Amino acid sequence: MSKILKSTTLGNVKNGGIFKALGKKFVKLDADEHGCLVLAKDIWTKMPFRDGDDPECPNDLRRSDVMKYLGNCLAEFTEKGTPLDTFIPFKIDLQDTTGQTEYGTVEYRIGLLTLRQYGKYWRLIPKVDTPWWLATPYGTPNCSPYTVGSSGVWDVNTDGSNYSSWCDDSFGVRPALYFPSTLWVSTEDEGEAGFCLADVPLDDLLAEIKSRAEE
C-alpha cells in the first residue's frame, strides 16, 4: 500500500486529521461556522518566549518575542501570495492559572494555543521531540504574592504533560491558526494508487473547470 496525496477542502478533513497547506503540515483540531482551528504538526522554531528584562509583564503574549516571530511568519506568507483572509482572526484568552484577567483577550491571525485549549484537544495533538510554548501565563502581577511564577509561561513537554517555565527559556513555537473550511489542502491516503489531482494534466484540469463554470 502506498501513500498518495489527495486534494480536498479543509472542511472535509476530520478533527485530528493531518493535512498540508501553505507548504506546512497541520493537524485540524476543531471547526465552527467561522472556520477551522488548526495547529502546526511540527515545531517551526525554538526560542525564548521573551528574552531580556521586562519587569512589568514578562509573560504577556502581547509583548513577547514569540509574537514578533509569528508576525514575521504571517508577513512571509502574504508576501509569497497567500491572501490575508486565509488567516482568520481568532481570540486568545490570556487569563492566568489563578484566574487573573489583566492581560485580557487578544485577537490575532496567528498565535499559540492556551492551556485550556490544550486540555481540550490534547488527544488530537501529535507529540513532538521538544517542549513547546502555550499562550497562558502561570501568574500575572496582580496575582497573589504567594503565587510564585509571574514570569512563568505554560508549555507542553515531549510526553504531552504540562509545565510552567521561565519566559526566557528556549522552547518550541508551534503556531495555532484559523483557516477557512473552504481552503484547499492535501491529505495523505494509504491505498492503491488511483486518482490524484496532482496527476491530472494542467490543460485537462483547466478544461474541466471551464466546462463546469459554463454549466
Question: Where do the PLM segments sit?
Answer:
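Collagenous Gly-X-Y triple-helix signature in extracellular proteins
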Residues: 1-205
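Residue-level detector of alpha-helical secondary structure
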Residues: 206, 210-214
